[in-house]
Every structure is written in structure tokens, then in C-alpha cells.
Amino acid sequence: MENLPKSNSHNNHISASKGFGSQSPKKAKLTNRQQSPNVAQLFAQAVNYHQQQQFDRALTTYRQILAIDPKYIDALTNLGSLLKRLGQVEEAIAIYRQGLALKPESAETWFNLGNALQEIGQLEAAESAFKQTLQLKPNLGVAHFKLAKVLQEQEKLIQAVDCYRQAIDLMPDSAQAYTNLGNVLKALGQLDAAVTSHRQALQLQPNSAQTYYNLGNALTAQEQYESAAAAYQQTLQLKPDWAEAQLNLAVALIALENFEEAEQVLKQAVVLKSDLTLAHFHLAKLLQKQGDTSTAEVHLRQCWQLQPDEPKIWEALLLALQTQGKYSEAIALLQNHLKRHPDRAIAHYYLGTLYNNLGRYLEAISHLQQALELDPNLAIAHNNLGYALIQNGQLSAGIDSCLRAIEIQPNLAMAYLNQGLALNNQGRVPEAIACFQETLRIDPDYHPGNSNLLYALNYSPDYSPATVADAHRQWGQQVTSLTQKVLPQKSLSKLDSQSKILRVGYISPDFRQHSVNYFFEPILRHHDPTQVETFCYANVPNPDAVTDRLRGLCHNWRDVYNMDDDQLADLVRFDDIDILVDLAGHTGSNRLLMFMRQPAPIQVTYLGYPNTTGLANINYRLTDTWADPPGLTDEYYTEELIRLPRCFLCYQPSPTAPAVMDLPAKSMGRITFGSFNNLPKITPEVIALWSKILQSVPNSRIILKIRWFDDEPTRDRYLSLFAECGIDSRRVKLIGLIPDPNHHLAFYGNIDIALDPFPYHGTTTTCEALWMGVPVITLAGQTHVSRVAVSLLSTVGLPELIASTPQEYVAKAVALASDLPTLGQVRANLRQKVAASPLCDAVSHTQAMEAIYRQLWQKSV
């Protein structure tokens, strides 16, 4: 409670004699019955002891008087006041009640009783006592003030306002009454009136730090941050060591984006008061904004030690730990929290989400399910459970979880995104596209939604190349308008353009066990250090053995998963990169938005994505003349196409790949076709054409292998699609995940002829099939995505396997299936043929890339 206001005639305790109350005891006076000389003498002595602060003697003497005359009202009054002063409040209350039993019309005693009751928190009883006081003395301003304060403490704010205003009417010079009124008005949201009241208090008490502080709080609530900051600064001039005022000043400065001064103020606040949790919290947030996450963590840990169960604190600490890649510590933090609060749904949600990020999907599923048992309406937990189920191969269950999330929170963009991912993995491309479009209706700038939509368009035969290209361009224009930070152009010199060792950066989320590395690792391994100094920017959350191997091949390795786009762009510029190469395009976890900052003078896209990025400031795209014949596809790219002299790909087969097996048709007595491609490539149109092949080759069968066939509804759908084309389910074998890479390759031993899907060709699957002795029939299209196999087959010397029409595609497959001797000969020689081809000539391929890099550099300077 604030200091009590003073009036001309009233102090904390009301007394009929001047000076009595909280300051001095009441002196003896005659009552309507004459006091005995002994009692009067004792009372005078007690008052003297009281005034001399000889409290023990005063207590003894007052009690001696009351033993003689229990109805001695002045002795009761003074004894009650003394007991209260000594902290014996309950005894004081009992004494006041004795006095009121003798003299119920005593406003003074009712007032003192109210004070005592308020002190021990008996607010309703205190309210009643102050109301009794005012019935007896309606114009007693201090009683109105005290009643208002008790009402305020009970959050009876509207009544408190009326009482403070009555107190002000009776005590117009009471600064504290104006201050308290201002605080109540602020709590009621009457901010203009609150500010006015605090300013009136300052007119009466211009050197009150507390009043400036309260004014600052009201101005902050009004979002008048400049005025609030000025008020807090006045507070600190009067009281420099007030840590809370420094905290509130910093909050105002942060709102004004004066981050540097706010940081200094917060540092002073935590020095003055090391247990001021909010100061540590805001300081941590500022440090995180500057990228100093490690120091931010120190302050967040201080917060956590002070308030370990405050959700905002452990959530912020959790984020800081994750940002630094301290996943084990983040897990330990959550596990520790759950030991104390096993029924806290949000903690299970965070732990499940963390396990999701680490790829530990079974553990993620367990904790997310526990979160939903505790809080069935936690939409984001349903969404993240859906993601975990999808990644665990349970596509249909994952879709159900996403739908439940949408039912609870219809505008949850991520739920539509994850539903779209699952539908895409099931091969339900039109439905997936619709989900991605709904994601973007909710959040048009959501980057994963945009990239997944653009990626999905490549699978669908329903969109023309021009339509797909326009969608990419429109996205590029959209993000260009949103990009706020573009780094200044690096100055280039012609003097050393020929001899300079080029600093080439590669950025990818796939520097791990991923098919991209069958094509990237041989380049990294064979770069000439006299020509190129390599930098790898690994946007990888969960490094593995492949990550470690690539790190060992690279001159400079950067882990950038926890960097935002600005931080990553600054790092690329700091590394003085000459040529920055994107290896992901619009595939998952790409960093295309970082390229908008133009961190390198030459920016290139290559390898990971079969179409344009749509970004005008990615200058070039590396390809070849088979995948992108000059004049055929150039108009679909925002980048300038740079064609390598041979295949744009260089394949590194697994050194532990099993040997090529005999032609299975010899032992099986029938031809087996197959495809190990992702399901969105295997559209109903593809199945219809494959079914014609099966119908044309009696007793033949087809094997499709992809991890998503572990989901029973997905298997059933594909069997139904074949059945609709007249193919009995006994002729279709669907295989799910084979986790061991060598066992996966060995499974090609069950296939005689591989069928390439269209319009989206296989890449890794085509190379694997060829390496394992399995010829691949492909249908050439008019875009890069439908010409990758054209490049691969031409490079290894098998152009006869390339069809230009669906009819020719069927005819080539049927003809090859009908010629077992030729098929057997192809199988026997195919691995050697591939190994001797330019497809596996890593040295020449890398030299060609380095020559292109040099040409691009010379052109730029």
C-alpha cells in the first residue's frame, strides 16, 4: 500500500487530542465519571512511557489500568494502538473490539480497527469497519481514502474510484489519493483519466519518483512510449537505483526500437537486482535479436532458476537451446519440467515437437499423443502428430490428425501444408495442390507453402510448362517485394580473373544421407584446390555419417541450420564468396529466400530441383543439351541456362553395391517390370500406360517399391488404380521401406525392365537401376523434368530406350520384354557400360564445372 495521505486534522489513527494517533498516545481526560486518582496517575505514567518509546513499560501499565477499570476507554484505545505498532495486530483487534463494545459510536476506534484488519488481510471486515467510520464521520477524507484502498485490494475497482474521488474532494492536496486513483483508472482501462490523475499528483508532489513511475506505466499502456520513457527517466533521476523503473524504461525503449540504449538500461537493472526476472528476460530477447544466443541463454537460465514453471521462460530457453543445436540440453529441460508437471500438455507438445525436429518420430508420436490426452483441443499438437505419423510412414493416420487440427483451428496453415505433404506422398497430387493452395490462402507469404505448391506442379500433367513457369515467376516477384535487406554489391577486379582461386559456396539441406549426394559428393571430392576453394553451408538439423564424410572433403564447412536468412547472408558475405550455388531449389528446407539478399556476386542453381527457382537474382542454372535443348525450354527459366558439355549429372555409385544378379525372367518364367520412384510421379496416367504394357506382355507383373506402401490405404489405392485398368492385383507387388541401402539395391535383382514415370522422370532411381543392370524405358517430354532420363540414357549410350510418344513407350517395353537374349546381354554389360560412360567420370565433370565457374567469373568482372 502507498503512503497514507495527510490531512489537517487526521493521521493514521484518529484522536480527539492533537498529536495522538500513530505518533503519540492519547493523554488522560475526565469522563462522565470521575477517575480515581490512582488510575489517572497510572494513565499519565503509561502515556509518558508510550511517548518515550518505553513500550514494555507502557504495555504493562495500560494492562494494570484495565485490570483496575476494564472500561477505561482511553487506555483501551492506546493499548490497541501500541499493540498494532508492535506487530501484535490480532491482539490489537481484540482490544479495539472491547472498546467498541463500550463505545460503539467511536469513529476513531472503528477506523483503527479497519486499519488493523486491513493489515492482516481481512479485507471484507476492514471494508465494513471503514464504512462504520464513515457513517459516524461522513466527511472524514482519510476514511474515504482507506475504504478506497481496501476496495482496490479486493478488485472492487469501480467502487474504489468513487471513494478515491470523495477522498480527493475532502483532501484536495492529497497527492497519494490522486496516485492511487490513477492506478485504479489504469486497471479499468480508463487510460486518459489515469494519466490526468497522475499528472495532478505530480503537481502536488513534483519530486515523487513513485508518481513518475506510475505515470510512465499509464503512458506505456497508452502506447505513448516516448512520453513513458521520459517519465521513467524522471523516476530514475529521483531514484537512480530503482531496478523496476529501469526495466520499464527499457520496455519503452524497445518499443521505440532504441535497442542499444535498452540493452544498457537492462544490464544496469540486473546488476541492481539480480533476481528481477523480467529484466533478464527482455535482455535475453535483445541479445537473441543481435544473434548473441549464447549470452541470451545465460540470462534465460537465470530467469528459469527464478521461475522454473513460467511457460514463457522455459519456452524461450528451449528455443535458445535449439537455436544453438543444444538438443540434448533442450530435451533434458523438458524432461525435468515433466518430472515436476507430468500432466502439463504443452510440455509434452514441445518435447514431441523437438523429437520431430530430430527425426525421432516414435518418441515424438508418444509425447504428442500424451499432450492430446491431456488437452484434446490443442490443434498444433494434432498438426505435429500428423507430421510425425507421416514421417513414420503412417500417411492415412497423419492425414486424420491434420484434419482434426483443421477442425479445431480452421486457419492453421501448417495443418493444410502437412496434409498436402501426405497426400503428395500418396500420389494424390491434385488434392495435395489444393491443400497447398489453401495453405497460401491463409498465409500467402508462408515459404514452405509456396515451395511445396511449386514443387507439386512439376508432378501434374494438368499444368502446361508455361503455367508452371509463370507460377514460379509470380512467387519470385512476390518475395522480391517483401525482401528488406539486400547487401551492397561486392566490388570485382579483372586483374586476377584468370589466376584467382574462386571461392565457391554450396548450400543445401541435403548434406546427409540423401540422394543428392550421389551426384554432389564426386564434385566436392574432385574439385581442384588450385582452382576452387569450397565452402559448404549445411542447412542440416540432424547430421549423420554422410555429413561427416562431406565435411572432410570440404575446405570450409558451415553449419547454418539455426541461422536466419539475414545471418546466413551475412556469413556468406563475410566468407567473401564469389559464386554461390543453390543445390535445393524448391525442395524441403531450402534457403532460397536468403538468395534474395544477394550475398554473392554470382548466384547459381543446380542439381536438386528440376525447374526454375523463379528468382531474378539467381543468375544461372546449370544443365545440359539433352535435358534442356537450346530453344526448347529457355523461356521457362528466370535464370540463364548454362549447358555443361556432357550430362549435367555425375553419378557416384555405392562402393558396397551388390553384384548384378542374373535376369530374373530366366528363373521366374515371366517378365517383371518395376519402378522404385516416388508415388507423386506415378500418376493415374502413368498407371494406365503401364497397364497397357502389362496387358501386352502375357503373365508379366510389376513391382513398385517405395516406403509409403507401408501405409495400407495407400497400397489399396494403387491396387485399385491398376484394377481400374484391368490389371489383377496378383500381377502387382507393392513393397514398402527397405532401410538398408544395399538390400534396397539388391531388390533390383527382382526386376527385368524398369519403367520411368512421366512427366516427372526418375533420377537416382534411374541411375541405380542402370548400375544394377536393369534397363530403363523412358518417355521424353518437352521440359527438363521430363527429359532427365533422356540425358542419363544418352550419356550411357542407350538412346534406343528413349520413346517420344506413349505408343512408342509401350512398344519399346514390349519389344525388350519379348527379347530375353538381348535383355540378358544388356543386363550383363550394363554396369560396365555405365562405369565407363561420362556419367561416372567425376574428374572430367568437375573440371567442366570449374571451367564454367571461371567463365562466369570472367564475364562478371
Regions found by a protein language model. Give the residues of each.
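Short hydrophobic signal-anchor/transmembrane segments that target glycosyltransferases
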Residues: 523-526, 684-698
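Donor-sugar nucleotide-binding helix/loop cap in glycosyltransferases
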Residues: 755, 769
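Short Ser/Thr-rich beta->loop micro-motif in glycosyltransferases that lines
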Residues: 584, 756-760, 780
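Substrate-binding clefts and catalytic carboxylate motifs of secreted carbohydrate-active enzymes
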Residues: 674-685
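Short hydrophobic "strand-cap" motifs at the C-terminus of beta-strands
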Residues: 507, 676-677, 705, 735
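Short coil/turn segments
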Residues: 678-679, 780-782
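A conserved nucleotide-sugar
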Residues: 531-533, 691-724
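Alpha-helical solenoid repeat scaffolds of the TPR/TPR-like class and their adjacent stem/linker regions
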Residues: 1-670, 720, 724-729, 733-734, ...
